[in-house]
UniProtKB/Swiss-Prot annotation:
Residues reported in the UniProt entry to bind FMN: 505-509, 584-616
Catalytic activity, as annotated: 2 oxidized [cytochrome P450] + NADPH = 2 reduced [cytochrome P450] + NADP(+) + H(+); an organic molecule + reduced [NADPH--hemoprotein reductase] + O2 = an alcohol + oxidized [NADPH--hemoprotein reductase] + H2O + H(+); dodecanoate + reduced [NADPH--hemoprotein reductase] + O2 = 5-hydroxydodecanoate + oxidized [NADPH--hemoprotein reductase] + H2O + H(+); tetradecanoate + reduced [NADPH--hemoprotein reductase] + O2 = 7-hydroxytetradecanoate + oxidized [NADPH--hemoprotein reductase] + H2O + H(+)
The enzyme's E.C. designation: 1.14.14.1, 1.6.2.4
Protein name (Swiss-Prot/TrEMBL): Self-sufficient cytochrome P450 monooxygenase CYP505E4
GO BP annotation list: mycotoxin biosynthetic process
Sequence ranges assigned to domain Flavodoxin-like in this UniProt record: 499-640
Ranges for domain FAD-binding FR-type: 678-906
Cofactor, how bound (note): Binds 1 FAD. Binds 1 FMN.
Positions that bind heme: C405
Keywords of the record: Electron transport, FAD, Flavoprotein, FMN, Heme, Iron, Metal-binding, Monooxygenase, NADP, Oxidoreductase, Transport
Similarity section: In the N-terminal section; belongs to the cytochrome P450 family.
An example Gene Ontology CC term for this record: cytosol
SUPFAM superfamilies: Cytochrome P450, Ferredoxin reductase-like, C-terminal NADP-linked domain, Flavoproteins, Riboflavin synthase domain-like
Length: 1048
């Protein structure tokens, strides 16, 4: 064997090794400096352990060969095991928990699942933009902190349905982030210091343990909350809790679930926030690149909402992000160790047990690959035509192979969206134009001290921005659209021959594509179908029918359910495939240049060499730049179907009888519940917006259109037919051991207005027909007490009966609440149903004048979601939560209801002044009054004076329709006087917390208007009306009939 060379490096000192060669605050920079001094491979000694660093593309290419090397958990990552244990990132090679978790979680990060997360990603991205817009262009923005908030909120919402609301809670970072930053920094430091030094740092160790306990406790709480309140969603948290390993059949232990929750919360946001921060740093340093990027975003996305389909059409944004990660890989190293002693670079021996760190900030600037300007920011080199020509393993910021980043697609989609959205929304500038890049190190890297200013483009205001959906479009995902059977677009139906589909799929994408293709071919007459994983085709490929294969490559290898099939083809032991007719469709991602389409190509070639007949040219879909389903449809039309017709159904075959395509015939009727109420008409939601900021009780604006005219006037009402909240329905189902689709039929007549002799699902019954939240009656309490065998619970129920007003009615305790509290009660479902009133309509005031926007109406309402007064979970308002659940295009059922005659505008608005007094959503009818006055003015009619007194918490939280009212005020339609309970010293509130106080500041004006026969309208709670009346009577004397109230 050729003599091996020793690995160079700085000379270590006894005991401390190379500790003094390392800057403990900037350890990475110290290592990079050594790389420039000692060359492509060097070593140092830390804590008595030899650490080897590789810094060239050639060495990286060798080290990424998974047949020779595998991941090693060393240094700071090993110290991080105190927190994340055997989670996906910190697990040792071959650790059993890693295998179980990896196989369970792979489908959760497939391309289709990531696409489905786009809307939630957009939600958080919009929050960032709203914050920057409202802060104004003079605000200095700590871009790293804001991107940290963004990425942590995104991973929590998209994968676990949990809102951290980091932009609203305070200026401080979320406690999880504070703990994470400490743990990451401490893990890195502990990995550098000698063991004896770490033992002496008792306070630091205790602080580390405290932060670890806090983070694992937060993860445990997420688990407990989801188990206590299950949600029927296909998210990561449910996958962690309920998923089963397809090989062993095992689920994950709670300890492993907690470790992986922490792994995702850290890895899912820390490196992505760094990527975004570095990307915007480089953009502001390179104005020509910034301008080209913005032009690409403007051209592709236009003025409408950004959709997930746009992202694949932004190649320059993609290149910018890749170049940013090349120069500043936010996870700056990963470590491997050899399976057996290996010679590296032809001259260095790497022994078993040695660890080699791939030092990415140097590897990815290798001048032999990227040229003499490798240290410069040049996005063009990352455009596909150049990127695809790079040597293998030249760009590795996401790690390697099976231990590479499982969430790469998630992070990339999120970052693409944020870059595009920010560029389209803002003009950006560095706060300090002379800022020099500094690096903040933990186990990851970020810019240190980099701040920007953001100005809305095109002179747009923050209010205008918030009134438009700036990000997400409701573009349908092909994976979830419905395919209606039928002979569409004149396509010919093929014959009734059988067909077999085989797929190879780890993440579920190729399986979904296979089922989509099978469904479309079903409509063409291929009704005898077999769909199975590729491994089931070993020694089982049919010869009397077409075989369609859809598969992909996973880290250069077959998917788990295709390994046996590929090995069978490669072994040469497979029999001749003469008579097999097949077609292959392959999926891939262009960033894996070395293995792009490797397995689909291999299967196609091996089957052909074994004698099988190709039906069609191999199809291909690139997940990086195209829509997989659209590519599949094109391949089906242009390649597969022509091949099938030619090979299986010759034109002269007289025995060929085309199957009649399946025609789907349906009828659609109104819900049965609608027919049980009088005069309900159908309305369609046309606009939705939230009127408040987090921190204030939520209030919403809902607009809808109805067919035909009505006789409604400003001040009138609408009856709304709601449904019960899904969580309340789930509680009722669970109490009576019913599945949602259990069928219930009422055979006998009953006093309740329920469907007779017609099956209704249990979920529909509890959702649409019964008042589940109605407070229990005294008789209900007596009946419950009579059915319990427990003397103790019987006495408690009778005590509630005796204290009914204070303990039941005042606390809104329902029969369902009591059944959950008193578990010994054995109440039949028939009795439960008989106890409950029928679900009734709810009444809301119109908040839009009927003539203001013909055929359109709106409601302004508070969403009631608060801790239950009886201490049992949360109390959800039935109608308000129903209205809050509606989406654009949703159908609801309403009926007009006139208000009392007095609660309308005076017939002559020219001479009759009005005074309107309200708080919160009590503004609704007065908004319709003011709009009607605006229409009156537009007819060149004079208007008498109008005053609006409006109370809320603060201008930032819940000053409803502020800008709109300001426009009406500027037009002379109304004068507005505000009171702010949280900020009474605000200049608009004149020191007043509540509207009754604000009335006193306008005493003279009110008295003058009263003398001119003004009408006073009040809309709000009973307490508000009482306080207002007391003030007005002290000011005006007896109010008589010109004082009109509407209490809710």
């Amino acid at each position: 064997m050729k003599d091996m060379e020793s690995i160079p490096g700085p000379k270590p000192l006894p005991v401390v090794g190379n500790l003094f060669d390392i800057d403990l605050e900037n350890g990475l920079q110290s290592i990079i400096k050594m790389a420039h001094e000692f060359g492509p491979l060097f070593q140092i000694t830390i804590n008595g352990q030899k650490q080897i660093f590789a810094t060239s593309q050639a060495l990286v290419d060798e080290l990424c060969d998974e047949t020779r090397f595998h991941k090693a958990v060393m240094g700071g990552i090993q110290k991080l095991r105190m927190l994340a244990k055997d989670g996906l990132f910190t697990a040792y090679h071959g650790e059993r928990g890693w295998g179980i978790a990896h196989r369970i979680l792979m489908p959760a990060f497939g391309p289709l699942r990531i696409r489905d997360m786009f809307e939630d990603m957009s939600d958080v991205a919009q929050q960032l933009c709203f914050k920057w817009a409202r802060q104004g262009s003079s605000t200095s923005i700590n871009i790293c902190d804001d991107f940290t908030r963004l990425t942590l909120d995104t991973i929590a919402l998209c994968t676990m349905g949990f809102r951290l609301n980091s932009y609203y809670n305070s200026n401080a970072l979320h406690p999880f982030i504070e703990s994470m930053l400490y743990v990451l920094k401490e893990a890195e430091l502990q990995s550098t210091l000698p063991g004896v030094a770490n033992c002496m740092r008792v306070k630091a160790q205790r602080r580390m343990s405290k932060h670890i306990d806090a983070m694992r406790s937060m993860a445990r709480n997420l688990i407990e909350e989801r188990r206590a309140k299950p949600e029927p969603v296909d998210d990561l948290l449910n996958t962690l809790l309920n998923g089963r390993d397809p090989i062993t059949g095992e689920g994950m232990s709670d300890d492993l679930i907690i470790s992986n929750i922490i792994t995702f919360l850290i890895a899912g946001h820390e490196t992505t926030s760094g990527l975004l921060s570095f990307t915007f740093y480089y953009l502001l340093q390179n104005q020509d690149v910034l301008e080209r990027a913005r032009n690409e975003v403007d051209e592709v996305t236009g003025v409408g909402p950004i959709t997930v389909q746009h992202l694949a059409k932004l190649p320059y944004i993609d290149a910018i992000m890749k170049e940013s990660l090349r120069l500043m890989p936010t996870a700056p190293a990963f470590t491997v160790t050899p399976q057996k002693p290996e010679v590296l670079g032809g001259k260095w021996m790497i022994n078993t047990g040695d660890s080699v760190n791939l030092l990415l900030p140097v590897c990815l600037r290798d001048e032999t690959v990227f040229g003499p300007d490798a240290g410069e920011f040049r996005p063009n080199r990352m455009l596909e035509e150049n990127f695809s020509k790079l040597p293998p393993n030249s760009w590795k910021p996401f790690g390697n192979g099976e231990r590479g980043c499982i969430g790469r697609a998630f992070a990339w989609q999120e970052a693409q969206l944020v870059v595009a959205l920010v560029l389209r929304t803002f003009d950006l500038a560095a706060e300090d134009p002379y800022y020099k890049l500094r690096i903040k190190e933990t186990l990851t890297i970020k810019p240190d001290g980099f701040r920007i200013r953001a100005t809305l483009r095109h002179g747009k205001s923050a209010t205008a921005l918030s009134q438009h959906n700036i990000s997400v479009g409701a573009a349908a995902s092909p994976a979830s659209s419905t395919y209606l059977a039928g002979n569409e677009n004149g396509r010919d139906a093929a014959g009734g021959q059988p067909v077999s589909f085989f797929y190879g799929s780890n993440s579920g994408t190729c399986k979904a594509l296979t089922h989509r293709l099978a469904s479309t071919m079903m409509t063409r007459g291929f009704t005898d179908q077999n769909i199975a994983p590729l491994d089931s085709a070993v020694d089982n490929l049919p010869r009397d029918q077409p075989t369609i294969i859809i598969t992909t490559t996973y880290d250069g290898q077959p998917t788990d359910d295709a390994k046996k099939f590929v090995a069978w083809l490669e072994s040469g032991n497979s029999p001749s495939l003469q008579g097999v007719s097949y077609a292959v469709f392959g999926c891939g991602h262009q960033d894996w240049t070395k293995t792009f389409y490797r397995i689909p190509i291999l299967i196609d070639n091996l089957m052909y060499k074994a004698g099988a007949t190709r039906l069609a040219t191999r199809g291909a879909a690139n997940a990086a730049i195209s829509d997989l389903f659209s590519d599949l449809e094109v391949w089906e039309e242009t390649n597969l179907l022509p091949g099938l017709r030619e090979s299986f159904y010759p034109p002269n075959n007289s025995n060929f009888v085309p199957l009649e395509p399946h025609q789907l015939q349906i009828s659609i009727n109104k819900p049965t519940r609608v027919g049980m109420h009088r005069d309900l008409i159908e309305a369609k939601v046309t606009a939705i917006r939230t009127l408040t900021s987090p921190g204030a009780p939520e209030k919403r604006h809902l607009e809808f259109c109805i067919p035909g005219e009505t006789t409604l006037r400003p001040g009138d009402h609408l009856n709304i037919l709601p449904v019960n909240p899904p969580s309340t329905v789930s509680r009722a189902l669970a109490r009576f051991n019913l599945a949602p689709d259990h069928s219930i039929t009422f055979e006998s007549s009953n006093a309740l207005d329920l469907p007779q002799a017609t099956p209704v699902s249990a979920a529909e019954l509890f959702s649409s027909y019964l008042e589940l939240s109605q407070p229990a009656t005294r008789n209900n309490l007596k009946e419950l007490a009579s059915t319990t065998p427990s003397d103790g619970e019987k006495q408690e129920l009778l005590h509630l009966y005796d204290s009914y007003d204070s303990l039941i009615r005042a606390k809104r305790a329902s029969v369902l609440d009591l059944l959950e509290q008193f578990t010994s009660v054995t109440l039949p479902i028939t009795t439960f149903i008989s106890m409950l009133p029928a679900l009734r309509v709810r009444t809301y005031s119109l908040s839009m004048a009927p003539s203001f926007k013909p055929l359109h109406y709106s409601l302004t309402f508070s969403v009631i979601n608060e801790p239950a007064w009886n201490g049992n979970g949360r109390y959800l308002g039935v109608a308000s939560n129903y209205l809050a659940s509606l989406n654009l295009g949703s159908i609801l059922y309403i009926s007009p209801r006139p208000a009392k005659d007095a609660f309308h505008l005076p017939t002559d608005q020219s001479s009759k002044p009005i005074i309107m007094i309200c708080a919160g959503s009590g503004l609704a009818p007065f908004r319709s009054f003011i709009q009607d006055r605006m229409l009156w003015q537009q007819q060149d009619k004079t208007l008498a004076k109008a005053l609006l007194f409006f109370g809320c918490r603060s201008p930032q939280l819940d000053d409803l329709y502020h800008d709109e009212l300001s426009q009406f005020e500027a037009a002379g339609v109304v004068e507005v006087r505000r009171a702010y309970s949280k900020v009474p010293n605000h200049y608009l509130a004149k020191g007043c917390r509540y509207v009754q106080h604000r009335l006193l500041t306008e005493t003279e004006t009110i008295q003058d208007m009263w003398a001119q026969d003004a009408i006073i309208y009040v809309c709000g709670s009973g307490n508000l009306a009482k306080g207002v009346k007391a003030v007005l009577e002290s000011m005006l004397g007896t109010l008589y009939e010109r004082y009109i109230t509407e209490i809710f």
